[in-house]
Amino acid sequence: MLFRSEPFALGGWTLRFFNTEPDSYHKNIGENDNSLAILAEQNGRRILLAGDMVNDTGDLARLANAIGRIDALKVPCHGERAVPQEALDKLRPETMIITNCLAEISDDVLVGIMSAFGRKAYSTSDSGGIALTLTHDGLEVSREIQLRETA
């Protein structure tokens, strides 16, 4: 079951929390299955921060069905677990942010990103930080590249 909060305003954004009730009816699930997701909306643009959600009990698929099309996705669980293709097909994010180094990202996640035409993926390991800025033309991605010194 996927519980959601009522939307509320914060600054110029409208926020809605998803997965707000603990999943207690599945005995063998990890804490990531109880992770919150936040949908942030402003001027018709939609960003989903999917936390550490996993799809062990179908939450990601239900979340995608409840939310529909988004502009950007913070890939859940650091990209270590696959996002079901069914969920990616519903969400259809143009931009994906992965909070992990590329070497740690699941092959299934990489295939999902690469198989979707037009999706751009950014990894925080390649950047000192990633910022999404809302512009009149859409979302702008800013990255601070950290150079690694070699010995």
Predicted regions mapped to residue ranges:
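Core dinuclear metal-dependent hydrolase active-site scaffold
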Residues: 3-72, 126-151
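Cap/insert and terminal regions of metallo-dependent hydrolase folds
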Residues: 58-131
